[in-house]
């Protein structure tokens, strides 16, 4: 039996980098058009009013305003933006 392992065998180095997923701007916080609200895999949250969805299911603001989370039918979670003009009045 060899007392040392052969050169080149490595058990480490397979850990993938974290993808920094999750909510970036929370309910009640102000945001600007284009701000990323949520990064996600699949539609854990669905786009509501004034929210766009990227091809990787990222939700982003289409207008300036305040973020609002709500639960719809069958526990489907939605994110919406209440426009800044509506919140000022």
UniProtKB/Swiss-Prot annotation:
Pfam families: Ribosomal_L27. The keyword Ribonucleoprotein applies. Keywords: Ribonucleoprotein, Ribosomal protein. One of its GO terms (molecular function) is structural constituent of ribosome. The keyword Hydrolase does not apply. It comes from the Bacteria. SUPFAM superfamilies: Ribosomal L27 protein-like. Gene3D superfamilies: 2.40.50.100. One of its GO terms (cellular component) is cytosolic large ribosomal subunit. InterPro entries: Ribosomal_bL27, Ribosomal_bL27_CS. One of its GO terms (biological process) is translation. Belongs to the bacterial ribosomal protein bL27 family. This is Large ribosomal subunit protein bL27. It comes from Bacteroides thetaiotaomicron (strain ATCC 29148 / DSM 2079 / JCM 5827 / CCUG 10774 / NCTC 10582 / VPI-5482 / E50). The gene is rpmA.
